[in-house]
Amino acid sequence: MGELTFTEWERKNEVASQRIQQLLRVLSKSKMLHVLYALVTKGENLRFSEIKKSSFTDSTTLTRRLTELEDIAIISKNEVSTNPPVVEYQLTESFSTIKPILEDLLHYGLEDANNE
């Protein structure tokens, strides 16, 4: 595999830039970090009500945030065929690439809270 041509480099740079911008748009939405924090700290296969309780988010906002996270493949939704039907959410492998960034944000917040 040789060096990239300038055009190839530009194309890859543009794709990376678009992905970063998309992620930042999603993460900056109201209650998004609360939802992700709930998913990270509460474990796998969380139900809507568990995420809602842990994230202090109303149903409408939570539905939007979960859909947005699903759209960018950060979470997946699993519909369990039971009566009544159950929907569970879990983080995907894609999340592992941004998990350290969110952990750093959490540590920053905790450090700031400890200084007050």
Language model features with spans:
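Canonical helix-turn-helix DNA-binding module
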Residues: 48-77, 84
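Basic, amphipathic "hinge/linker" alpha-helix immediately C-terminal to the N-terminal HTH DNA-binding motif
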Residues: 81-102
